[in-house]
């Protein structure tokens, strides 16, 4: 050993792990299994520091579990379908398949130098026919089980990508990929029946004790269970077949405040009216240009069209309410019709103000409050208010009490029925794109929609496609599209829609248990490896991916692909923070920001002396030039330094800011550990030392603290303990035996974080085999109890001294020692203490 050379060390130990197949996962009855999985990446072509942090966290857990005697499954794959590949093909003239597999190779080559404990033999991409062919088999099984169906639906249409978007893929009214304003269209779509599982998906959240409470709450709100009233308004001289307008409301207590009825532009009544009225037709067409998401609806200007129709109030048949077609009402929420209560709903308030409709309060903050409102009064349902127009329950009651009373009243008087509904809608999976999993059905003029035969799977994507024009190339590919009907053999056409890419990521965790099987899963492997013991990924996937995966696990269990024990696929979930970096910017003549690379800025100025504005802790973004390239860091400092820094600088659930000085400090520390090992290796093997027991006691405390830190995801806290123990070992005068034991234990404790350095130290000190497979050190409980304790002494709240005393002294003995300390005597300066407070094992407070 001469000096710390990460490039040489890391390559050597990665080769050793590879040749010894250390991370290859094989079923074993002799060890408890542990399945750790990070959310697999999209193959963009370059890894970023977020990848480094995410996969390093998973690697720490995987390596720790391997050392503690577990049979670890730690796989890697690629979430490879989706629009970016098609966009790249259109931009550079290539093919999505070539672009994707090229990126996968590049990212794999970038990822392997990190030294991750991945079983690469299980690797797959979702665009592999071997993978999506099994996904097609799952689809057919789901179809047979009634979990998939087809219907006409109002969808979010991206006019640039020319595809359907799920509500969650629309951001501020725009497509999440293209940025185009989203439109509403009615198309025939395939759906998963996730809504049938609403109650189970909701109630089972209580069993996910090792998930963040925030994620469970987000899913609970998304599923959106509500108790309300279903009733009808009678139309006055309405069109044939429309003598009633059905409404579902979660606030039946506000019925006496109703001033209008609103219906969706896609409500059957609105569609009937637009046939004969050009103005209605034009208004409805304009409404359909907006997206279907709640966000799009809420941010759009509230517009209505008075149909001229009137309905009777169910409590007062003499009262008539106007019927408006309104752009903020969606057909697939509730019944597609609402009653407007402007006094207690801000959206209705704005609408009523715009169209000069009555604003009628049904409850007030207090009995003497003013009824004239400048905005809607919307208290929490748990707040007690005065019902000035109540019809059920007490005058003073909470909203929850009033809602229950209103439902009881309406049921008793034949006005309506109490109903439980869910916000969760069925999952539309059809996408009008090429680069996705083909839906394995055929459309036959004689037989209708016919499932493809399983022996014909996979239905592979054709390679010879063109992206010269927008839309789905599969529609323009007759030799692929045209096929015999599987049922009758007559000419038919394949389904040209492909599956939403969230389907691909909703079961990949199960496929990893048997990635080369000729069925979606192998039950024996699924029973052994499932569930995922620890899942790691971003909070941005709290709703879509995680909820869909929970549904898929249930569907796979229903169709015989997973055991009952795996219907909740992720036992524990950890959502990590981002890696951030400063942004360096100046302003152009128009005041617009101009971004600069970090290497172009020195002491807050550019080379020409221009002062730079520094924005701290910003998300890394190529456009803002604050992206740190992991490959550059690895080349300069090594993978262990990158790993150490992203783990050490912040709690893992919080963002960590990347700084060059932090990386340099991490590298210097690892160099110190290296140098320390070299010094210990050169010690006289027979020389006696001082403080052996003290060093070994500190070592066992470190073992305990690091173990607890790793098990609780407190990686930064564990590393802080490693820093402290390293400093103690550097100063130690103990003999060779104690110092060798300490440095080898330090290598073991650092191994999950800095595996290459740990292997080299272990080998240099003569350790058996690989440190990666060495048993995790155990703390001796007896060594964790110290004979002495160090107590700070405060005088009137200010720290004045420290005393080292026996741990078993009485309070009176501690008082005597504290008052006899020279520093305390000087600080008292002859004053007599009024009170002495001894907190055992913690502190001595002297009050004068």
From Swiss-Prot:
A motif ('KMSKS' region) lies at residues 619-623. Its EC number is 6.1.1.4. It catalyses: tRNA(Leu) + L-leucine + ATP = L-leucyl-tRNA(Leu) + AMP + diphosphate. SUPFAM superfamilies: Anticodon-binding domain of a subclass of class I aminoacyl-tRNA synthetases, Nucleotidylyl transferase, ValRS/IleRS/LeuRS editing domain. Pfam families: Anticodon_1 (PF08264), tRNA-synt_1 (PF00133), tRNA-synt_1_2 (PF13603), tRNA-synt_1g (PF09334). It is found in: Cytoplasm. Transmembrane segments: none annotated. Keywords: Aminoacyl-tRNA synthetase, ATP-binding, Cytoplasm, Ligase, Nucleotide-binding, Protein biosynthesis. The keyword 4Fe-4S does not apply. GO terms for cellular component: cytosol. GO terms for molecular function: aminoacyl-tRNA deacylase activity; ATP binding; leucine-tRNA ligase activity. A motif ('HIGH' region) lies at residues 41-51. It is an enzyme of class 6 (ligase). This is Leucine--tRNA ligase. The lineage of its organism: Bacteria, Pseudomonadati, Pseudomonadota, Alphaproteobacteria, Rhodobacterales. The gene is leuS.
């Amino acid at each position: 050993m001469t000096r710390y050379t990460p490039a040489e060390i890391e390559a050597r130990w990665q080769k050793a792990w590879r040749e010894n197949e250390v991370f290859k996962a094989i079923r074993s009855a002799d060890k408890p299994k542990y399945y750790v999985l990070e959310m697999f990446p999209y193959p963009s072509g370059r890894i970023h520091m977020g990848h480094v942090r995410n996969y390093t966290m998973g690697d720490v857990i995987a390596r720790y579990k391997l050392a503690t005697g577990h049979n670890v499954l730690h796989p890697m794959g690629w979430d490879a379908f989706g629009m970016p590949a098609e966009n790249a093909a259109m931009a550079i003239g290539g093919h999505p398949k070539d672009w994707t597999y090229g990126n996968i190779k590049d990212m794999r080559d970038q990822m392997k130098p990190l030294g991750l404990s991945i079983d690469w033999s299980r690797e797959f991409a979702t665009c592999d026919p071997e993978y999506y062919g099994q996904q097609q088999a799952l689809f057919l099984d789901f179809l047979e089980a009634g979990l998939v169906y087809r219907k006409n639906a109002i969808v979010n249409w991206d006019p640039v990508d020319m595809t359907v978007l799920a509500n969650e893929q629309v951001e501020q009214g725009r497509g999440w990929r293209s940025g185009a304003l989203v439109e509403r269209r009615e198309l025939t779509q395939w759906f998963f029946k996730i809504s049938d599982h609403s109650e189970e998906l909701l109630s089972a959240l209580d069993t996910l004790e090792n998930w963040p409470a925030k994620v469970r709450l987000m899913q609970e709100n998304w599923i959106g269970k509500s108790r309300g009233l279903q009733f009808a308004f009678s139309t006055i001289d309405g069109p044939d077949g429309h003598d009633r307008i059905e409404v579902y409301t979660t606030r039946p207590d506000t019925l006496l405040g109703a001033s209008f009825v609103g219906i969706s532009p896609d409500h059957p009544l609105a569609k009937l009216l637009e046939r004969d009225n050009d103005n209605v037709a034009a208004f409805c067409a304009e409404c359909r240009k907006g997206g279907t998401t709640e966000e799009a609806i809420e941010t759009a200007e509230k517009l209505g069209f008075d149909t001229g129709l009137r309905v009777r109030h169910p409590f007062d048949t003499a009262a008539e309410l106007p019927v408006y077609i309104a752009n903020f009402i969606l057909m697939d929420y509730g019944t597609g019709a609402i009653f407007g209560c402007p006094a207690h709903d801000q959206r209705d308030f704005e609408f009523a103000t715009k169209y000069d409709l009555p604003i009628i309060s049904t409850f007030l903050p207090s009995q003497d409050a003013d009824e004239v409102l400048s905005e809607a009064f919307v208290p929490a349902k748990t707040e007690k208010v005065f019902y000035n127009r109540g019809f059920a329950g007490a005058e003073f009651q909470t909203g929850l009490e009033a809602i229950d009373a209103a439902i009881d009243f309406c049921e008793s008087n034949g006005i309506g029925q109490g109903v439980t509904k869910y916000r969760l809608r069925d999952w539309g999976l059809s996408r009008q794109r090429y680069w996705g999993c083909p839906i394995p059905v055929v459309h036959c003029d004689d037989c209708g929609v016919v499932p493809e035969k399983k022996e014909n799977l996979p239905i592979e994507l054709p390679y010879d496609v063109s992206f010269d024009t927008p839309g789905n190339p599969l529609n323009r590919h007759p030799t692929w599209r045209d096929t015999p009907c599987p049922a009758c053999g007559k000419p038919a056409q394949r389904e040209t829609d492909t599956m939403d890419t969230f389907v691909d990521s909703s079961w990949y965790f199960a496929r990893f248990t048997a990635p080369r099987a000729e069925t979606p899963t192998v039950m024996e492997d699924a029973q052994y490896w499932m569930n995922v013991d620890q899942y790691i990924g971003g909070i941005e996937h709290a709703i879509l991916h995680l909820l869909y995966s929970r549904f898929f696990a249930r569907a796979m269990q229903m169709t015989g692909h997973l055991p009952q024990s795996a219907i909740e696929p992720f036992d524990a979930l950890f959502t990590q923070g981002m890696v951030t970096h400063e942004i360096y910017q100046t302003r152009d003549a128009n005041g617009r920001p101009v971004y600069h690379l970090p290497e172009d800025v020195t002491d807050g100025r550019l080379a020409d002396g221009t002062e730079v504005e520094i924005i701290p802790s910003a998300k890394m973004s190529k456009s803002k030039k604050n992206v740190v390239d992991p490959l550059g860091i690895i080349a300069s400092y090594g993978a262990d330094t990158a790993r150490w820094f992203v783990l050490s600088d912040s709690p893992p659930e919080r963002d960590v800011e990347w700084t060059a000085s932090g990386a340099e400090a991490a590298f210097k520390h690892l160099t110190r550990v290296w140098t320390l090992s070299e010094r210990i290796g050169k010690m006289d093997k027979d020389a006696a030392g001082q403080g052996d027991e003290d060093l070994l006691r500190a070592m066992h405390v470190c073992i305990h603290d690091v173990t607890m830190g790793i098990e609780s995801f407190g990686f930064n806290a564990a590393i802080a303990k490693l820093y402290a123990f390293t400093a103690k070992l550097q100063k130690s005068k103990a003999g060779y035996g104690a110092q060798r034991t300490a440095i080898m234990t330090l290598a073991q404790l650092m191994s999950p974080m800095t595996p290459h350095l740990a292997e080299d130290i272990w080998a240099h000190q003569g350790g058996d085999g690989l440190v990666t497979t060495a048993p995790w050190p155990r703390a001796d409980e007896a060594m964790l109890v110290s004979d002495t304790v160090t107590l700070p002494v405060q005088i009137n709240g200010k720290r004045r001294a420290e005393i080292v005393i026996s741990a078993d002294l009485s309070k009176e003995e501690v008082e005597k020692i504290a008052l006899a300390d020279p520093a305390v005597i000087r600080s008292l300066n002859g004053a007599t203490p009024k009170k002495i407070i001894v907190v055992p094992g913690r502190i001595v407070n002297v009050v004068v």
